[in-house]
Regions:
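Metalloprotease/metallohydrolase-associated module, dominated by Zn2+-dependent proteases
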Residues: 2-10, 116-128, 146-156, 160-162, ...
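Conserved aromatic-histidine-acidic binding/catalytic patches
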Residues: 19, 76, 80, 105, ...
Length: 285
């Protein structure tokens, strides 16, 4: 039988040799994690971009059929470097895995619908570190424009934060996707709303950068009457942009993606703000 003294010596040895070092390591790891997080936020605040936005291990893959759809249907994906294409494919796969796709009015959801919609969301958030949208868990797809019992109007698309859903008329989504230079793209517009709303409700690094950029954009416009007048007079942005701040950003986003050269040429400061908000440094942007 071990004596009390020997037991105490054994316990003290156990504490000093194992428990204390483990405790120090745990505290050290926690402190290091907090310091890294503080550094990342400081870096983002100063340079207006995340320290890093992409992961380089354990990347998901699409099925062969889904990959062919992505490659054939999405010009933005084709213009990326091979390294960025791997990241893009991973994020499209994650969107499909983590969101529920629901066909309405007996619509059968296909891989084309899943990949094309997921690729639009991925494109817009590709510069984000935290790219998954908390306010979207369900993608509802109607065959065409649908009637809303709430406001008694036909809709082509909407974001419903209460239901954590984004809704599309597939006919109109596809039409906007197929014509890439008319600045009318339902998918970009509605995901623009989702990104804007998501950033307003979060404090991650990408949301911080987005919100700072949007505040900079609105301050710039409020303090430059001539720019506001030029915006309206140019008719480059459709009139719907001036409905409210959310529609303004969503319309600007359509133009930013579909006609970036013209956007940059006509309104370079706005273009710079948009590019910074999205951390968009890909393809020809």
């Amino acid at each position: 039988m071990v004596s009390k003294t020997e037991q105490e010596i054994f316990e003290m040895g156990l504490i000093s040799n194992y428990i204390v070092p483990i405790g120090i390591i745990v505290i050290g790891v926690f402190v290091l994690y907090r310091l890294i997080k503080i550094f990342q936020y400081s870096y983002a605040s100063i340079y207006k971009k995340p320290l890093f936005a992409q992961r380089y291990f354990m990347l998901n893959n699409l099925t062969r059929a889904q990959y062919e759809i992505l490659k054939n249907e999405h010009s933005f994906f084709r213009d990326l470097s091979r390294k960025d294409q791997l990241q893009f494919e991973h994020r499209v796969s994650k969107f499909i895995q983590t969101n529920t796709f629901v066909g309405k009015q007996d619509l059968v959801v296909t891989d084309e619908m899943k990949v094309t919609i997921a690729a639009t969301a991925t494109m817009l958030s590709f510069g984000f570190k935290k790219y998954q949208l908390d306010i979207v868990e369900t993608v509802m797809i109607y065959p065409n424009a649908y009637y809303s019992q709430i406001n008694k109007k036909f809709h082509k698309g909407e974001v419903n934060p209460r239901l954590k859903a984004i809704v599309f008329s597939w006919e109109d989504f596809k039409h906007g996707h197929n014509i890439e230079d008319d600045n009318l793209n339902l998918g970009i517009h509605e995901f623009g709303h989702a990104i804007h709303l998501n950033a307003s409700k979060n404090n991650d690094i990408s949301s911080l950068i987005f919100n700072q950029g949007f505040n900079k954009l609105t301050t710039y416009l409020q303090s430059n009457e001539s720019v506001r007048q030029n915006l309206i007079a140019s008719k480059y942005f459709r009139a719907y942009a001036y409905t409210n701040q959310y529609e303004f950003f969503a319309v600007l986003l359509e133009n930013f993606i579909e006609t970036p050269s013209e956007f940059q040429s006509q309104f370079p400061e706005l273009y710079k703000c948009m590019k910074q908000m999205l951390n968009f440094k890909f393809a020809s942007y």
